[in-house]
UniProtKB/Swiss-Prot annotation:
NDH-1 shuttles electrons from NADH, via FMN and iron-sulfur (Fe-S) centers, to quinones in the respiratory chain. The immediate electron acceptor for the enzyme in this species is believed to be ubiquinone. Couples the redox reaction to proton translocation (for every two electrons transferred, four hydrogen ions are translocated across the cytoplasmic membrane), and thus conserves the redox energy in a proton gradient. Gene3D superfamilies: 3.30.70.3270. PROSITE patterns: 4FE4S_FER_1, 4FE4S_FER_2. This is NADH-quinone oxidoreductase subunit I. [4Fe-4S] cluster 1 binds at residues 63, 66, 69, 113. It is a peripheral membrane protein. Binds 2 [4Fe-4S] clusters per subunit.
Amino acid sequence: MSGLIQAAKSLLLLEFVSAFFLAMRQFFSPKPTINYPYEKGVVSQRFRGEHALRRYPNGEERCIACKLCEAICPAQAITIEAGPRGNDGTRRTVRYDIDMVKCIYCGFCQEACPVEAIVEGPNFEFATEMREELYYDKEKLLMNGDRWEREIARNILIDAPYR
């Protein structure tokens, strides 16, 4: 009996017909790709992109020069030099450099920071033609923080219950 069923399947080309209908169903289904750079995909709030230094609402930078991010960085991409902030004896960063060529975007610096000063923002479009442009200094990091502060604050607020 199984020989008769096998002969009927091969005579009627059932495998071919089922494969054809499968191909047609996939052909007319919506495409999962997007037309980048004209269309942007959705980025998760936990996405780890370009680094940024944040400021307090009064404009003062958040970094207290504790150097925890420098100590925990597995790629040794962060360099910090501390100096006195003012007459009150607190410290501030005189130099804060990140070598983005070395960075592996692990997020340890963001997790180690006690005041949420260094964060990895939502920006993933920072390609460059010059290697020197991937050495971020304090001014570049603060500029990134000012540019992306709304999105960064929203993402931290959304992710706060899970930390």
